[in-house]
Curated annotation (Swiss-Prot):
Belongs to the aspartate/glutamate racemases family. It is an enzyme of class 5 (isomerase). This is Glutamate racemase. It comes from Salmonella gallinarum (strain 287/91 / NCTC 13346). Pathway: Cell wall biogenesis; peptidoglycan biosynthesis.
Amino acid sequence: MATKLQDENTPCLAATPSEPRPTVLVFDSGVGGLSVYDEIRRLLPDLHYIYAFDNVAFPYGEKSETFIVERVVEIATAVQQRYPLSLAVIACNTASTVSLPALREKFAFPVVGVVPAIKPAARLTANGVVGLLATRATVKRPYTHELIARFANECQIAMLGSAELVELAEAKLHGDSVSLEELRRILRPWLRMPEPPDTVVLGCTHFPLLRDELLQVLPEGTRLVDSGAAIARRTAWLLEHEAPDAKSTDANIAYCMAMTPGAEQLLPILQRYGFETLEKLPV
């Protein structure tokens, strides 16, 4: 089916009738959340998915905590007013570290967050050096340091915060090539270490989109660890045990916050991920 572009004032075309399915919102500031959505969809292909991305305020890594909390709650509320939700996944590490309490207080449906996969990385490392690749905001958050103290206190944690990697991942999904030299420059602090990390936590949902390029630049044998599969399993459990009975027969839909040329360029990509329409969400 051809992907359809719609503004908020355009009525959504009727979806092909199907069995009612639980409705799951996957939210990110950009397109990185598609990496999490893809893991969930592999495990749970028969759900009604809504993907929302905040291309007005992207990237969140440079925004204040207060702004992020208010913004995420506002967007989730706007989606919930259109589709009763069974569950929401905040597929953004930066937003997850600050907005989950407010979301869980406001909404009755379960809210799943994304946290850096430090615990499994600490188990996998052979040389005891674990790299955390994230946004600068995630690197600085007390929550991240609490995870390290709890699960990786016997490891050396090399943290690297980068907003540029987020931009590179977004550009790649728009069809641009990724400069390996640029990646080497960003990763230089690790590449210059006498003993670089043998296990790297991808602490931003954008970074799995750069997996192939990162493996070309990092030392041979480096393991890359992310939270996608664990989030999918958690989503499945919550839908079975705790989620409200909010079902829909509608087709999957994506929401942006502004219908920009960049958003329009995402149409073929969103189609490949199974979203039939892209609409502007008025917030």
